[in-house]
Structures are given as structure tokens and as C-alpha cells.
Amino acid sequence: MRVPAAVTGGCGCGVDGGGGCCRGGGKLADWEEGKDDEMKSVVVKGWTRMAQVVPLHDNASAEDDDDDEEDDDEDDDDDDDEDDEEEAAPPYVMAVDDSSVDRAVITALLRRSKYRDSGKRALEILGSEPNVSMIITDYWMPEMTGYDLLKKIKESSELKQIPVVIMSSENVPTRISRCLEEGAEDFLLKPVRPADISRITSRMLQ
């Protein structure tokens, strides 16, 4: 776990500079339209206005293998394909943030997106969604802070094994230390960079 350096650069939209800015850019719009139609995406309700579950990679190769298999019984084929798809389900990240811009940024960096508005159901979804492998949450949100969400997750015997990453635009050492001591996997300072997302997702998938 690292304690990040001071925040520098960026336009305040949550994207590190260099052509990826969400203000009027085309890159983010592509992801918002769900350019990768074959990707599976589960939309959930969050602690503020939205929480989104984003698959980190597809299971196209597993589905291709299913297509190559032949069986005389068509019904059995369908059942087998469904079972294989369930077994090949990709890991998911739940992004929780009261800022629609920051949610979209995280989604774009994770390269899979389909989402809509929702309410306060993050913990409920965590209890019923077995494929959630990591949670990325903003620290400062109305109604429930990311720190409070972290505490509830770590207090749950069923959820405490899920890595939680906290994000914040404020570099407050005491806040960072408190989150890490409470069990946060990492603490990211906004604007979140692609390298940050790559680092934490690579570590999670090992």
C-alpha cells in the first residue's frame, strides 16, 4: 500500500492531462455509448447517485470454446454454454462516487462501461454479486463517506476480503493514514491516472 504524493496538474475533471480530458473529448463518449457491445456489465445502485460494477476483461475466449463444442442434444448444449459462461465470468470492480464525471473517468480507465442512475444500495449489491472483486470509492460523499463504507465492508465477515481503494482530491495525510489503517488497499489522489488503475487492477488479478 502506498501513500500518494501531492496532487498536480489536471483540469479538475478527474482526468490526468494529455488528451484524455472528459470535457468535450471523444474518448469518453465512446465508452459511454458502450462501444464494446460484447462486454458484460452489471448496473447497481450506490451510496449516492450511482455505483457501477465494471468488468475488467471479457470472456470471449471461453464463449468461443463453447461454440466449437458439439453435442447431439441441443438442450444440453444450451445448459452447458450457460454453465461455462458463469464459470468464465470476469472479475468486477464497483465504482462508488457522487460525481458523475469521476464515475465516468474510472469507467473509461477500466475500459468497460454501461451505466444509469441509481440509489443507495451498494452494500445490498455486494451481498448478492459474487463477482465483485474490488471496490473503488470516493472518500468524501454525502450521506456516507468512503471511509464509512470501508469500515462497514471490513466489519462484514462476508465482504471483508474484497479490496477497497479510496479516492480523494484532497491530500490529507491523517485521512490517508486512517483509511490505510482501517484496511484500504490503496489511496488514490485525483486526478486518477491510467497508471494508478493499471497498478491496482494488475495486483488484484494476480
From Swiss-Prot:
Work out whether the entry's keyword set contains Transcription: yes
Q: Which CDD domains match?
A: REC_typeA_ARR
Q: Which domain of life is it from?
A: Eukaryota
UniProt region (Disordered), positions on chain: 53-92
Query: PTMs?
Result: Two-component system major event consists of a His-to-Asp phosphorelay between a sensor histidine kinase (HK) and a response regulator (RR). In plants, the His-to-Asp phosphorelay involves an additional intermediate named Histidine-containing phosphotransfer protein (HPt). This multistep phosphorelay consists of a His-Asp-His-Asp sequential transfer of a phosphate group between first a His and an Asp of the HK protein, followed by the transfer to a conserved His of the HPt protein and finally the transfer to an Asp in the receiver domain of the RR protein.
User: Which tissues does it occur in?
Assistant: Expressed in flowers, and at low levels in roots, mature leaves and shoots.
Q: What is this protein called?
A: Two-component response regulator ORR7
Q: Which organism is it from?
A: Oryza sativa subsp. indica (Rice)
